[in-house]
Amino acid sequence: QRSMMTAFYEARTTALTRQTDVKVIIYKGSDISRKLRQVGVIYKVKGEDGLDLGWVALNDGFRMPEGVFFVPSASNFSSFVKTSGQTSPSEIFKSTFNNGYTGAYEIVGVPEFPSRQPIAISDGNGDWFSYQFSSDGLSLNPGALVMLAMGHLDGDDYYVIDNPYNQLGFAIRRIGITIPFSDYSEMEETLR
């Protein structure tokens, strides 16, 4: 949880200091060593003429520890995650993007990460989930939830959540800061 919140902090700080758009990206592609675990920050670079050159990685990003992963939104949940035993998918808190008002894309195509050279990215399709900050450090996903869970990969490359109460997460405020939940019971009180 702390590493993920740090990525959002770095993204907001980069947006403010470089006065440019910034995205926190989470890998959702087929590489199982990275799926829902690799997190990065990319920012838009402009040339001297003010034209967009592309997006550059802030740093190498990080991978969450094995067994910890990003919980996709409800519309993507069943494509990546299963529950076991008596656990119902409705018991799992899913991430949200809250981008209806801002129009920020929740999925982007990043052909290479990390890239030190500016590269073009595609909006609306690709192998990465995305949360965005504007050049003034505001979240384009105001009120969105970023949820993490613990589980294991099964033979079909789905994450299986054994214990829904082993969840952590945080909310993103419009001003770009993150507010963590201390445990599952706090999430229940706040979100149900």
Place the predicted regions along the sequence by residue.
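N-terminal helix-rich module
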Residues: 2-9, 13, 21, 26-192
